[in-house]
């Protein structure tokens, strides 16, 4: 049922044109989709993004990154006492940086690279495709994704870095 919600959201309208999208608006749209789910599990979902940040990307790709990363974080925090997920978007002169932080268990030491491989999962009922899909999309835009422990939330902190410009 949960995966059907995601599929229905992504099918809602065509988002396949490479164009400048306002990332704050796109985050709010994805956030609206998650509101019922996070409320039912008492999860705090925060988005931090300046209203003026835009990036040239297919909207379907941006939404797929965000949805897969939030879904991954959701699975990590839903059984915990302190349930928080934060998505922060910032930019430098040359890059867009998206941070996905959660208060889950974090990534097991030594698994930082292999979790991005297809069918690798640390979850009991996981398929192991979400992070691989994100990695493929990020690399399509000549970007990078990495993970470390969140200093503030103590779970995982995924960092997506995408170059600006027409590379």
Question: Which role does the model predict for each range below?
Answer:
Residues 107-119:
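Short conserved segment of the HATPase_c
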Residues 1-37, 42:
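Conserved DHp (HisKA) dimerization/phosphotransfer helix of two-component histidine kinases, i.e.
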Residues 143-144:
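Conserved glycine-rich
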Residues 102:
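Acidic ATP/Mg2+-coordinating residue in the GHKL
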Residues 82-94:
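Short beta-strand/loop element within the Bergerat-fold HATPase_c
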């Amino acid at each position: 049922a949960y995966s059907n919600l995601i599929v229905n959201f992504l099918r809602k309208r065509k988002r396949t044109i490479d164009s400048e999208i306002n990332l704050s608006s796109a985050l709010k749209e994805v956030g609206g989709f998650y509101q019922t789910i996070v409320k039912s599990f008492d999860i705090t979902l925060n988005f931090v993004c300046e209203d003026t940040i835009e990036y040239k990307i297919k909207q379907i790709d941006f939404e797929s990154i965000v949805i897969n990363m939030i879904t991954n974080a959701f699975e990590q925090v839903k059984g915990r006492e302190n349930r928080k997920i934060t998505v922060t978007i910032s930019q430098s002169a040359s890059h867009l940086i998206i941070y996905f932080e959660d208060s889950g268990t974090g990534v097991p030491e030594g698994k930082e690279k292999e979790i991005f491989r297809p069918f690798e999962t640390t979850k009991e009922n996981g398929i192991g495709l979400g992070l691989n899909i994100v990695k493929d999309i990020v690399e399509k835009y000549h970007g990078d994704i990495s993970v470390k422990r969140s200093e503030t939330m103590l779970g995982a902190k995924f960092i997506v870095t995408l170059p600006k410009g027409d590379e």
